[in-house]
Every structure is written in C-alpha cells, then in structure tokens.
C-alpha cells in the first residue's frame, strides 16, 4: 500500500446521481492492483479534521498487470463531504489517495465450476474490473459466471451496455438485470422484475459447484447471504463486501 496523488483526466455521468471518474497518478506511475480491490481518497471536513472514503477500482484491464487509468464510480450522497469534493472536481484537479486495499477478489486456488456475482448500485464496479479475468477463466478452467445486478430502473443500471456486450462475446458469462421499480421500455431476455433474489433463485445456487460474491447495499448482502446459506452454500463459498454511504 502507498499514498499518491491522482489527477482527474476524464469523467461522465453514469446515472443521474452516479459519476464515473477516470484518474491517472500525478507522478505518471501505472497503478498496480488486483481486480476487486479498492482505493481510499483522503480529504478534510470543513472544520479541518481528516477523513477518507473507499471506492472500488472499476478499471477493465487484463487482470494481471498495472493500468494507466484508475476508474471509480461515485454515488452522490445528499450533504456528503466526499460527494461535494468529487462533484466539483474538474479535469486536471487532484486528490490524495492510498491503496490498493481489500481481498474481494477472484482466488487463484478456486476449483468451482460457477461464480454467482451479485450487486446493487455501485457495487457492480469491482465486477467490471474482473472482466479480463472472467474472460480468461471461462476458457482456461471452463468456469461459468452469472452477474445478477439490481437497479431501481434502467437509467440506474451502471455499465449495463458493457455487460450486455460482454455476455454476447463471452459464452460462459451471463448478465441478469433486476429492476425493482420500473422495467425497461423494451425488456431483454434476461431482465427480471423485482430484487436480485428473484433472479438468483432461478439460477438455483448449488453448493457443489458455486462460489458467490455479494457487493453493494448492506441489506441486500445480508438477505442474499441468508438465501445462499439456505441453499446449502458454506460461509467460505460466500464472499461479501458492503457499501455504506457516509456523509
């Protein structure tokens, strides 16, 4: 782990309240990380006290080397100090950061046949970073991957077109969007109405073949963890990361 400055080089809105930000290290050094890890951005509250926020790295690489750009997705919290900082950051602006951290990663010694990747909101970001690894594992080990992603409506389906395109390109990967409030105007084959547990139940989790990853809203993570345990998966087969909004 090290500390460094990041310079914003590009950004765009992914959804009405979610911004995609692409940074490069100010010193020009490529950023080495394992897909699934996160960074911390350091700043100060208005009273001068130091604080930090964690963001999963969403950069799509080959899964084994350093990358030039470090990409994150920031969900804005009303009155949030980090939200204000990153909403006002212009291209060329810098922030202090450290990392990488975390173990929410695909494990080299896994021997399962299928991965169930479950997310809500910006919790889908680490799975985007894993796409290079996923492509490799579908051929090297014959693994299958099912990404179950919950959003309230199509406009909040982050990186949805990327995942749809990847599913068309990689036969061992399937994408299952779940819309809890408003379905798409033009539904697609894998779309489901309701929460992620609906699609997950249809996938019939199997302790003999599956390892599950859960990332996003804490309630979703807890409820899905319970569902998977009821299906027979052991605790080591369920890997979790909760996203908690902070001001």
Q: Where do the protein language model's features map onto the residues?
A:
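Ferredoxin-reductase
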Residues: 2-91, 180
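Reductase modules of NAD(P)H-dependent flavoproteins
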Residues: 2-5, 145-247
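A phosphate-binding catalytic loop at a beta-strand-loop-alpha-helix junction
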Residues: 114-130
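Generic structural signal for buried aliphatic residues
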Residues: 39, 95-98
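Short, conserved phosphate/pyrophosphate- and ester-handling motifs at nucleotide-, phospho-/glycolipid
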Residues: 36, 123, 217
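Short, charged beta-turn/beta-strand-edge "cap" motif at the junction between a beta-strand
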Residues: 44-48, 99-104
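Short helix-loop-beta connector
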Residues: 108-113, 206-209
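Acidic/glycine-rich phosphate/pyrophosphate-binding loops and surrounding catalytic core
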Residues: 89, 111, 128
């Amino acid at each position: 782990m090290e500390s460094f400055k990041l310079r914003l080089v590009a950004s765009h809105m992914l959804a009405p309240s979610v911004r995609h930000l692409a940074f490069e290290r100010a010193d020009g050094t490529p950023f080495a990380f394992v897909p699934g890890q996160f960074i911390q951005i350091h700043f100060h509250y208005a009273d001068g006290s130091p604080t930090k926020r964690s963001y999963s790295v969403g950069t799509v690489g080959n899964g084994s080397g350093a990358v030039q750009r470090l990409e994150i997705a920031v969900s804005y919290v009303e009155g949030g100090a980090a939200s204000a900082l990153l909403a006002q950051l212009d291209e060329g602006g810098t922030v202090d950061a450290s990392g990488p951290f975390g173990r929410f990663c695909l494990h080299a010694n896994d021997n399962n046949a299928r991965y169930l990747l479950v997310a809500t909101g910006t919790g889908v970001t680490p799975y985007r970073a894993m796409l290079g690894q996923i492509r490799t594992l579908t051929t090297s080990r014959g693994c299958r991957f099912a990404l179950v992603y919950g959003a309230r409506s199509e406009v909040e389906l982050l990186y949805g077109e990327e995942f749809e395109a990847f599913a068309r390109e990689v036969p061992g990967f399937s994408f299952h969007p779940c819309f809890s409030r408003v379905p798409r105007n033009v539904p697609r084959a894998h779309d489901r109405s309701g929460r992620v547990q609906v699609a997950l139940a249809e996938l019939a989790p199997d302790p003999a073949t599956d390892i599950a990853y859960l990332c996003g809203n804490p309630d979703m993570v807890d409820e899905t963890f319970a569902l998977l345990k009821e299906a027979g998966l052991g605790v080591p087969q369920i890997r979790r990361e909760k996203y908690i909004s902070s001001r």
